[in-house]
Every structure is written in C-alpha cells, then in structure tokens.
C-alpha cells in the first residue's frame, strides 16, 4: 500500500504527509480491540453516550 502524499507541497518545504503521522491509514489495518478507557474516549462513540 503506497503512502499517499499531499499534492499541495511547496518546493523547499518538507513534504507533508497527506494524513499526518498516526491518522489511521497505516494504523487502521491492524484493528486491535479497544480497552475500556479507549472506548470511553472514542470519538465515534461519543454521540452514543
């Protein structure tokens, strides 16, 4: 899987990754179950609380 780069790169600057470090994308491929503390703070579940 190719890491996608942002296409708004200014020459001379460091290339910004399209999603930033740790914004899913690589991490979401390995879905480990969340701990209880993470479930409480999960943004997808906040609307359910």
UniProtKB/Swiss-Prot annotation:
Q: What is this protein called?
A: Small, acid-soluble spore protein O
What induces this protein's gene, according to its Swiss-Prot or TrEMBL record? Expressed only in the forespore compartment of sporulating cells.
Per the record, the similarity remark reads: Belongs to the SspO family.
Its localization reads: Spore core
- Classification via Pfam families: SspO
List the taxonomic lineage: Bacteria, Bacillati, Bacillota, Bacilli, Bacillales
**Any keyword Transferase?**
no
Protein origin, superkingdom: Bacteria
For biological process, the GO terms are:
asexual sporulation; sporulation resulting in formation of a cellular spore
Q: What is its main location?
A: other
Give the record's GO CC terms. Answer: endospore-forming forespore
**Residues covered by region (Disordered):** 1-49
Instruction: Supply the alphabetized keyword list.
Output: Sporulation
Q: Does the keyword NAD apply?
A: no
Q: Which InterPro entries match?
A: SASP_SspO
């Amino acid at each position: 899987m190719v890491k996608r780069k942002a296409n708004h790169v200014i020459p001379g600057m460091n290339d910004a990754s399209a999603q930033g470090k740790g914004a899913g994308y690589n991490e979401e491929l390995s879905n480990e179950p969340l701990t209880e503390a993470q479930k409480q703070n999960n943004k997808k579940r906040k609307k359910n609380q």
